[in-house]
């Protein structure tokens, strides 16, 4: 049979067949054997040996591309190969016959040039065997295809030489042409052999997992997969790669079709053998239903996902497959997150996992035991070189340290993950690992830099994220949400509430809970207290049902701030105490410190600054050690207010000392606010400093602070100076 210049017999009965490209590779091997050791240097021979494996295993490439690869390793040998192929293509059919006859001599003699069991020897034997099985008409078609292959290569070489002599603009066009040609090389090549197909599928799967930008485009990859499936429709792995490729473009119909075909082919080919006395097709059926449920869940088809899960549970119960049932229970929890009983499902999942010895979750333990469990799992991951699980574990620890309020440890874990070389990536020839773990770590890194006022560094991290995870990739939503949150915080710090309000829509589309919370923050900043209170109460009820403790505490703090800004600090105290109890119960140290900060502010408003100072001494250390720059400034500003309020009853000398200490703390707070460009708070600090300098009789310093206040007050007009109504 002849297809696209490729002569092959029974596709399933032979693993290799002769193509014009493989004839060119055979010429290269023959020339390497004929060339003496002195003619080729040791470095060039080493490069050629490294080049051979991808040439033997990879798909067919154009002749010009092959010339270029050989020339990079050994220019002298590239010239010999080019001359030899030219003589064969411009000669007669008997030259091709003679060439294959000469190949058999490579195995003869006491010291043959090639060993029969080596990689090169097996390739030569397969090619000789495949050529010997061809009929005369097939040999003639192969020779015609070789001539066409040579002519196309010569034409491409001439075009490249002409374009190299053009100017810079022409060079840009050449680069664009090269990209299109590379895609055509893959799509226009003939059917792949079994080894080539396996190599191609494993390579593209590794690229989709680790570095999607270097993989073929969705259209080119699908075209190549369709070409592969046309000659071998029962190739299950090709159907699965087609499923992954369709997920890239969010094609629900094609991805479902490919997924079902994958499990069908597993049953037909017998790839799923007997397991624990069960037939392989039963295992394929239940895991097919489970994967189908996961697919529908990804696209938001929750009703179809529940139906598929019910089918998977029914088959798993009939087969007594507890592992599959555990997976189904976990997916039931994912599907039920919008319901009030989701936490009950999670508890059942954990109990079932513990009962059957399947540690899928670790809950209900203290923070130190949680970290110990992660450490023990890391030991197993490193022992067995499970690089993907290592990455996930480090990303989890990064998120956990941030949740507990230890930004320094979170930063260390994120940098550790980014500096690691994945074992799987190196074995697959991929230089970077573009998994979800790396996206999470980079997003944490960007947010940590933004919290410290390093917006340029955060911007560089986000720029790298956008290049590493294009907008159409599956993990792009992570950096999109991170970017929107950083822009929102900067707009709020700068007093641009209208800009922050416009960003709420994008945040809501990516994370509904976060978007509603940010909307309430904007309404509160715009003094729309009634609307903000209604929104916060609805969000609080919803988060309490979902057991989202971190967001519950954040909402409680916003509700308390709303109360004291409405001149009701006594109502805010029970709310703050509830938030403090939750943060202490779940050991959220940073949120606990922030809650204590709010309690101290409430006590200041109630007229007990001495008690507020005592509370501040408990909370300020974690904030100064691991807190965001804005929170550090708020803490120092509050300390200054408490010092001034406490000094009202002091004698003149002691009062002057207290005011001097308050001024120093105000200067430190102003420096913190300046790092995040929070001009509204800088204005408040400048006003407060001017009043203190006036009380101390320092006219020059007072005038300077008054001038700064006036400039900022003109840029940020307001109805009054909010020194007491917000923290």
Curated annotation (Swiss-Prot):
Ranges occupied by TPR repeats: 194-234, 235-285, 286-322, 323-359, 360-390, 391-438, 439-472, 473-512, 513-552, 553-592, 593-632, 633-668, 669-708
Annotated InterPro entries: Apc5, Apc5_dom, Apc5_N, TPR-like_helical_dom_sf
GO molecular function, one term: protein phosphatase binding
Pathway(s) per entry: Protein modification; protein ubiquitination
GO cellular component: anaphase-promoting complex; cytoplasm; nucleus; spindle
Presence of keyword Protein biosynthesis: no
Subunit structure: The mammalian APC/C is composed at least of 14 distinct subunits ANAPC1, ANAPC2, CDC27/APC3, ANAPC4, ANAPC5, CDC16/APC6, ANAPC7, CDC23/APC8, ANAPC10, ANAPC11, CDC26/APC12, ANAPC13, ANAPC15 and ANAPC16 that assemble into a complex of at least 19 chains with a combined molecular mass of around 1.2 MDa; APC/C interacts with FZR1 and FBXO5.
Family to which this protein belongs: Belongs to the APC5 family.
Protein name from the UniProt record: Anaphase-promoting complex subunit 5
Gene this chain is encoded by: Anapc5
